[in-house]
Amino acid sequence: MKGRVIVLDHVGDMEAAALLVDGKLDDILIDHSDAPRPGAIFRGICDRPIKGQGGMMLRLPDGETGFLRQGKGLRPGQPLLVQVTGHAEDGKAIPVTDRVLFKSRYAIVTPGKPGINVSRQITDDDKRDAVLGIAHDVFDSAHGLILRSSCETGTADDIAEDIVAMSALADAVLSDAEGKDPEALTEGDGPHALAWREWSRPARVETEAGSFEAMGVLDQLANLEAAHVPLSDGNMFVEPTRALVAVDVNTGNDTSPAAALKANLAAARALPRALRLRGLAGQISVDFVSMSKAHRKQVEQSLRAAFKADPIETSLVGWTPMGLFELQRKRERAPFPIELFRSL
């Protein structure tokens, strides 16, 4: 199977979307948690400041608690619009930000940050001018607007419709900012909406019930239960612990002088996908095969290139004195629900 295929289906009663690239599972989105989705917007009520951290705990609907990292100048009881930025770890508050965005396939509306900006990924000057022209025709707001890279292949009508819809949503939500009680204002996008929003490159779309089984998605999901990840040169094990995600890279049966570098480069290229499919994030520690310091730069360059193409924000922290490489990855997704999947 060649090319890109987006598969929209359900796993049990859970809405799910899969992205296949040349038949290989490249990304998976499953709505398996009752927690607020990333992107959901609430009117929160400031509860108590976190001394020494500068943060603020907020009351959210349904008894949930949010944590705002920058809470300076806020007072208990004050209403505040906040947006969920990721999934909370067990026993911790939901991470939120007061920098609310309204994001769709073609447009992002940014309240409090005026101006119209076009994605740098659109490099053709004529296309940039055309996209800006569409925006100026339909966007008359004090909010800011970012035109996403997907505008390059979108039609003028679709782009204009997206801009108008996001602008109207922003106005509606901001008008409901005041109130004494916490309230859910938007739900955040589910897997099917997220697939439409984020997987914008040309692809065939399958929507028939049972497509996950017919397209081989279920078989590939079953493989995620194993920590073992085969590589073109060697293998690696990706294992989450309570404190961090541990990654161990091995050369396999190859004992040639170049084996270590080949295995490490293969692991660097494969790591974003392995983390993405498993929904793993937080602190990540990679134990590469022992190599010379001269080869470390090559591996680090390969890591940077691989994560640049990954949709989830990841910071490459660097090498530790013991030769491990550390990364910090944003918790945008919950871990893949292998227990739920096993029971189906």
Where do the PLM segments sit?
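Ordered, soluble secondary-structure elements with a strong preference for glycine-centered loop motifs
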Residues: 36, 40, 68-75, 91-96, ...
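Short glycine-/polar-rich loops that comprise or flank the Walker A/P-loop
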Residues: 3, 63-64, 76-80, 103-106, ...
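Short glycine-centered, acidic/aromatic-flanked micro-motifs in structured strand/loop junctions
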Residues: 70, 149, 288
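Conserved glycine-centered short motifs in functionally critical loops
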Residues: 54-56, 88-90, 94-96, 100-109, ...
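Long C-terminal interaction/binding lobes of large macromolecular proteins
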Residues: 80, 180-183, 198-208, 253-258, ...
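Extended, charged alpha/beta regions that create polyanion-binding interfaces
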Residues: 1-35, 40, 89, 97-142, ...
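S1/OB-fold single-stranded RNA-binding interface
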Residues: 4-21, 26-29, 35-87, 93
